[in-house]
Amino acid sequence: MIKTYLAIIISCLTGLSLQAQYAYFGNRGTISFDKVTYTKARMRQMSNDMSSKMMDRGMGFMEHLDKMPESHTDRMNLYFDENATVLMPEESTSTEKQNGEGKMRAPNVTANGRGGRNQGGARGGGGGNQRGMLRGGANKNGKVLYQDLKAGTADIQLNIDEKYLLSETLDSITWRFTEEFRNIAGINCRRVNGATKDSLYLIAYYAEEIPVSAGPALSHGLPGMILGLVIPEMHIQYWATNIAYTNNLVPTDWRDKKSKQMKLEEFSALFGRYMPRNRQNESAKKRILEQLVY
């Protein structure tokens, strides 16, 4: 009888140990993100860029700037496992913030890291209807970003005049670690400052509790999942709001077999031809690539 009790106790302790390990170091699951685009600031910058290049359209933007919302928020889901991630929008979940009014779940972070608020959230073992969300609940016309972490490649599926599936190698990002920390979705995250090969400045907050080197908008290269991503130059921010650990692999049924496949660089060159002559340069191509990814 004593041996039986001991066996039960050992079994319970082992189960609790495994459960704790799974809860704190989960490498499969779904992360809900708020993607916040600061519309006015973004349009103001575009107008200034056009004005500096002697383009008449720049002044046209300024006339309508006061009528634009301060920001626009899209809800995104990031599905992840040890080897891959898929980021796609939820259906009908965008919100706008007019003239500084209204609620916004994501904190505001400037390039120097000041301002904003801590992000609360829930963590759990949900996500059992993951594939159903992809087939029925996801925005089928929305952009989908896929990372193959093992192969170091990415696919971007988007719908313009028709559906395209663009392939690209994951570019390295140079990261510089700081001693600043922020709580995002209930997890303590460390801030790092980064730069892409095209010198686009990034601010990221990653969590070692999720040992997957990935994040939203094809971000990667850190010793943990990126739960906060800020692109100051583009006035775009991603903030995790909820994390659900599961046993599911990243789904693959998001791909449309009818999508037109090409390299990302080919796509950039193709659409660059429709831009004004004075914008057919490397800077314009860079802008196109940034718009596709972020």
Annotate each PLM feature.
Residues Q19-N188, A195, Y201-L202, I231-Y294:
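Extracellular or lumenal secretory-pathway regions
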